[in-house]
Amino acid sequence: MTVQTSKNPQVDIAEDNAFFPSEYSLSQYTSPVSDLDGVDYPKPYRGKHKILVIAADERYLPTDNGKLFSTGNHPIETLLPLYHLHAAGFEFEVATISGLMTKFEYWAMPHKDEKVMPFFEQHKSLFRNPKKLADVVASLNADSEYAAIFVPGGHGALIGLPESQDVAAALQWAIKNDRFVISLCHGPAAFLALRHGDNPLNGYSICAFPDAADKQTPEIGYMPGHLTWYFGEELKKMGMNIINDDITGRVHKDRKLLTGDSPFAANALGKLAAQEMLAAYAG
């Protein structure tokens, strides 16, 4: 007998009119074990350079009908790339716009994964006690030890990051100082912070979560309503080229901008980022 799971968004009782994804959508798009593999870096980096993670600090995303989507950073999209980078020898720091704790879509956590969960527990304090991004930006110069900026996905990246001057300043610093920028899924929404000023990403190509897919998610109860705007449309307006229109786990490299299309790309993006950064810093 087949058990039918509900496509109705699940109530988040921590906030008025807020919702988690439906049981059905979680059954289709989350797993208790990740697809982490290929973590093989026999000559890891041993230097001082590290990763700056710009994480989400807000949980609730308004939709077109007034309902709130309970979101944050997607755990797979955050932890798998970092797992690879850490195994390759690169430590990381976490910053949020406010300096308040990172918000995760904990309903997508691979809670039975025997590699990812210990890694998360080992680094949980970094996410619970992040730096304030403005303080990091104020300290940036040509000799700063950050080798890359990583913006994880999850719909939480749509909240605050696209309007942040601190995000813009961090990205401008990274591109102008020949550092890597790594992102996937909804994370590239952070690039919109560059649209009202100096935009060094003009003309770059990326993979990202397609707007067309976002428009379909309410049908299965992943979100409780439609988005009020679509980040892909806005990225194209600022001169960026999104090369995918579907979700296949694709990754892409354009100079030192490394991107992936969805959580299905998280492992491949981690491998790509680790390989590229090892070639640049440990070659």
From Swiss-Prot:
BP term (GO), one: protein repair
Protein EC: 3.1.2.-, 3.5.1.-, 3.5.1.124, 4.2.1.130
Active site, renumbered: 185
Activity sensitivity to pH: Optimum pH is between 6 and 8 for glyoxalase activity. Significant inhibition of glyoxalase activity below pH 5. Optimum pH is 8 for aminopeptidase activity.
GO molecular function: glyoxalase III activity; protein deglycase activity; protein homodimerization activity; thiolester hydrolase activity; zinc ion binding
Residues that coordinate or bind Zn(2+): 86, 91, 123
UniProt KW DNA-binding keyword: no
InterPro entries, A to Z: Class_I_gatase-like, HchA, Prot/Nucl_acid_deglycase
Temperature dependence: Optimum temperature for glyoxalase activity is around 37 degrees Celsius. Optimum temperature for aminopeptidase activity is around 43 degrees Celsius.
Disruption phenotype: Cells lacking this gene show a loss of glyoxalase and reduction in aminopeptidase activity. They accumulate methylglyoxal and are more susceptible to methylglyoxal than the parent strain. Cells exhibit growth defects above 48 degrees Celsius and accumulate higher levels of peptides than wild-type. They display increased protein and DNA/RNA glycation levels, and exhibit strong mutator phenotypes.
Superkingdom: Bacteria
Regulation (activators, inhibitors): The glyoxalase activity is inhibited by copper and zinc cations, activated by ferrous cations, and inactivated by thiol-blocking reagents. The aminopeptidase activity is inhibited by iodoacetamide, dithiothreitol, EDTA and 1, 10-phenanthroline. Binding of ATP at high temperatures induces a conformational change that reduces HchA surface hydrophobicity, interferes with its ability to capture substrate proteins and inhibits chaperone activity.
Domain notes: Consists of a large A domain and a smaller P domain connected by a linker. The thermally induced motion of the flexible linker-loop region leads to the uncovering of a high-affinity substrate-binding site that is essential to capture nonnative proteins at high temperatures.
Miscellaneous comment text of the record: According to some authors, HchA exhibits an exceedingly weak proteolytic activity against bovine serum albumin (BSA) and some peptidase activity against small single amino acids conjugated to a fluorogenic reporter. Another report showed that HchA does not display any significant proteolytic activity but displays a physiologically relevant aminopeptidase activity.
Stated role: Protein and nucleotide deglycase that catalyzes the deglycation of the Maillard adducts formed between amino groups of proteins or nucleotides and reactive carbonyl groups of glyoxals. Thus, functions as a protein deglycase that repairs methylglyoxal- and glyoxal-glycated proteins, and releases repaired proteins and lactate or glycolate, respectively. Deglycates cysteine, arginine and lysine residues in proteins, and thus reactivates these proteins by reversing glycation by glyoxals.
Subunit architecture: Homodimer.
UniProt-recorded name of the protein: Protein/nucleic acid deglycase 1
Organism: Escherichia coli (strain K12)
